[in-house]
Amino acid sequence: AEVPMPLRQLTMTLPDGREESVMERTTLVA
């Protein structure tokens, strides 16, 4: 899925070393 540039830059590195976009993370948590 293509993520808009502003959101694409908002990535966080998970403890297991993966990078996950904040947008995806919010969807999983919600």
UniProtKB/Swiss-Prot annotation:
Disulfide bonds: none
Domain of life: Eukaryota
Record's keyword terms, sorted: ATP-binding, Hydrogen ion transport, Ion transport, Nucleotide-binding, Translocase, Transport
Gene Ontology terms describing biological process: proton transmembrane transport
Catalytic activity, EC: 7.1.2.2
Catalytic activity: ATP + H2O + 4 H(+)(in) = ADP + phosphate + 5 H(+)(out)
Single GO MF descriptor: ATP binding
ATP-binding is among the record's keywords: yes
Function as written in the Swiss-Prot or TrEMBL entry: Catalytic subunit of the peripheral V1 complex of vacuolar ATPase. V-ATPase vacuolar ATPase is responsible for acidifying a variety of intracellular compartments in eukaryotic cells.
Protein family per UniProt: Belongs to the ATPase alpha/beta chains family.
Note from the entry: Two separate genes encode the catalytic 70 kDa V-ATPase subunit in psilotum and equisetum.
Subunit relationships: V-ATPase is a heteromultimeric enzyme composed of a peripheral catalytic V1 complex (main components: subunits A, B, C, D, E, and F) attached to an integral membrane V0 proton pore complex (main component: the proteolipid protein).
Record protein name field: V-type proton ATPase catalytic subunit A isoform 2
Organism expressing this protein natively: Equisetum arvense
Organism lineage: Eukaryota, Viridiplantae, Streptophyta, Embryophyta, Tracheophyta
